[in-house]
């Protein structure tokens, strides 16, 4: 019995001695890095007594200390490498450029002319533009004089690229401009797109210096064309087409308001809901109908402004109201419904003109020659006189046949009688050219005052995409075939809608006015009287006097904001006349 108990006690001690060994072995299996040191010793001596004598817990503790030291050394080495890389980068990126590398020259070396020409054709980048200081801001006249191409910058709505002709050396330059909130411009650096042509300067100056001796027949002949260097002379004024007089306007207003009975509406007269109105007596008119009354106001008040300035190139117009309950509109009820016109809406009725043909832009207003002054008139006079002298000399049969078959200038006056002597024909051709230019001077002044977007400015704006558009007929401009009268059509964008878009299109308006230095004296005199009497008051009085109470109920008068802008633009035109007189 005693032996059995001693045997069981010995077995329990042996089991207790093996339990720590099992824990150490399991721990060694979980930590693979420690098993590399202790595992071979355990596998080589499987005897339990020898395992207990080797003290495995002490070996495990030493292994963990070695692993911690190794990790600590790795962290320190990593931090030291990061610090060394940072110091090296600082030295390479900052210290070396400041002290170690040579500086570039302040001014680049002179390049050959061929290389300069190659550099000049590189496209401009908006981020390379450096505008001048605010104190050196320029006016539209200073920026756009002699400019022949404007291109809106897509990335910057207030900026545009300007190409202009340098009159000093005949070269073409390009630069950026930026419009400021004050309406002035900041100009970027210029770059030359073409070579200087100094050989052109002397002939140009010579041609612009005609002799003023009273014995010179050329000067005597020019005296009737230009007066005081800025006005068209009596020869041109007396030859101008009569146009539409004040009595035509009075009779048309009476006809529309009292006598006219609309019988039907027909398609025509432009876009959208405009219609051709046919009256009972066969009279026709173009009806301008818009959902927005601003364009109706612009059309009728632009016409009133033309009347106050004695510009006879505007067809008679009158404002009325669509009301099928009245005898004037009752017969056209079906056509009005089909046209989707609404009752009690204002319309502008303009007398229909049947003998109209397209009118082009004269050469003096096309790029690169967009200017008209006394020198241009003198040069044109001398040129046509030299042609007349050449034609007066006897020619052979083949030369006469060739001259007879040569085509005339596109979009120019063709109403010259082919009877009479060659001298009379040449004089008639010269006067016809000057008549067209005189009417264009009124057109430029009128469109600038009302800020019309739908005529020449339309061509100028689209010139950046279509270079041939300036040679095409002008938008909303026509010519009467018989009288050669230019008719200014479609002025609905004037005075209101055009004023809202001045920030975008003012450069194009100023471009035309700044290059005009020959005006009609009656127009400028009327403009001075209008400025003194008050443009807003005169326009509103004319509106009250010529429209019915029904029209005034649905069509507002001219806003004060438009009147203020109009007065500013009147001063701008008068300032341009004064500047031309001093030049």
Swiss-Prot record:
PTM per Swiss-Prot/TrEMBL: Proteolytically cleaved to yield a secreted protein.
Main location: Golgi
InterPro entries, per database record: FJX1/FJ (IPR024868)
Positions of region (Disordered): 179-222, 384-421
Glycan attachment positions: 310, 379, 491
Enzyme Commission code: 2.7.11.1
All ranges on the Cytoplasmic side of the membrane: 1-78
Tissue: In the eye disk, expressed in a gradient ahead of the morphogenetic furrow, high at the equator and low at the poles of the eye. In the leg disk, expressed in concentric rings, possibly corresponding to segmental boundaries. In the wing disk, expression is localized in the wing pouch; low in peripheral regions and high towards the center.
Comp. bias regions, Basic and acidic residues: 187-199
Enzyme's top EC category: transferase
UniProt record similarity statement: Belongs to the FJX1/FJ family.
PANTHER family given in the database record: FOUR-JOINTED BOX PROTEIN 1
UniProt name for this protein: Extracellular serine/threonine protein kinase four-jointed
């Amino acid at each position: 019995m005693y032996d059995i108990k001693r045997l069981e006690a010995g077995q329990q001690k042996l089991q207790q001695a093996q339990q720590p060994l099992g824990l150490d072995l399991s721990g060694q299996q979980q930590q693979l890095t420690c098993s590399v040191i202790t595992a071979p010793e355990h596998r080589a001596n499987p005897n339990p007594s020898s395992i207990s004598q080797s003290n495995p817990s002490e070996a495990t503790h030493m292994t963990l200390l070695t692993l911690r030291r190794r990790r600590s050394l790795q962290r320190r080495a990593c931090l030291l490498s990061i610090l060394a890389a940072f110091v090296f980068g600082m030295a390479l990126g900052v210290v070396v450029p400041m002290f170690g590398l040579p500086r570039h020259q302040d001014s680049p070396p002179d390049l050959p002319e061929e290389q300069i020409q190659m550099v000049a054709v590189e496209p401009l980048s908006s981020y390379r533009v450096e505008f001048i200081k605010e104190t050196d801001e320029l006016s539209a006249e200073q920026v756009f004089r002699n400019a022949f191409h404007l291109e809106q910058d897509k990335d910057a709505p207030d900026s545009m690229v300007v190409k202009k002709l340098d009159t000093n050396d005949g070269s073409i330059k390009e630069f950026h401009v930026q419009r400021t909130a004050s309406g002035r411009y900041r100009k970027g650096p210029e770059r030359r797109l073409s070579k200087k042509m100094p050989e052109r300067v002397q002939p140009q100056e010579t041609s612009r210096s005609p002799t003023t001796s009273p014995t010179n027949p050329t000067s005597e002949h020019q005296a009737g064309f230009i007066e005081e260097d800025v006005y068209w002379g009596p020869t041109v004024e007396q030859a101008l087409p009569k146009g539409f007089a004040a009595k035509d306007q009075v009779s048309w207003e009476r006809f529309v308001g009292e006598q006219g009975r609309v019988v039907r509406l027909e398609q025509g007269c432009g876009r959208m809901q405009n219609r051709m109105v046919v009256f009972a007596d066969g009279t026709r008119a173009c009806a301008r109908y818009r959902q927005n009354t601003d364009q109706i106001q612009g059309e009728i008040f632009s016409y009133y402004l033309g009347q106050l300035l004695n510009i006879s190139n505007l067809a008679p117009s009158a404002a009325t109201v669509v009301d099928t309950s009245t005898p004037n509109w009752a017969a056209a009820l079906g056509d009005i419904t089909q046209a989707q016109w609404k009752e009690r809406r204002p319309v502008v009725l303009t007398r229909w003109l049947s003998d109209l043909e397209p009118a082009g832009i004269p050469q003096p207003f096309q790029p690169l020659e967009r200017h008209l002054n006394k020198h241009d008139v003198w040069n044109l006079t001398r040129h046509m006189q030299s042609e007349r002298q050449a034609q007066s000399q006897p020619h052979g049969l083949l030369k006469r046949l060739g001259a007879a078959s040569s085509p005339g200038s596109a979009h120019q006056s063709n109403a010259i009688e082919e009877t009479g002597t060659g001298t009379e024909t040449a004089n008639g051709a010269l006067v016809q050219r000057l008549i067209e230019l005189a009417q264009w001077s009124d057109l430029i002044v009128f469109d600038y005052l009302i800020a019309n977007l739908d005529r020449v400015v339309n061509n100028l704006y689209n010139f950046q995409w279509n270079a041939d558009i300036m040679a095409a007929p002008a938008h909303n401009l026509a010519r009467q075939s018989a009288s050669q009268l230019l008719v200014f059509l479609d002025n609905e964008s004037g005075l209101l809608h055009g004023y809202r878009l001045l920030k975008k299109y003012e450069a194009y308006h100023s471009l035309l006015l700044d290059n005009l230095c020959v005006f009609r004296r009656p127009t400028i005199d009327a403009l001075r009287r209008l400025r003194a009497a008050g443009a807003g008051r005169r326009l509103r009085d004319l509106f009250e006097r010529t429209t019915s109470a029904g029209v005034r109920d649905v069509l507002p008068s001219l806003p004060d904001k438009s009147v203020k802008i109009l007065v500013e633009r009147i001063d701008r035109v008068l300032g341009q006349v004064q500047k031309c007189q001093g030049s």
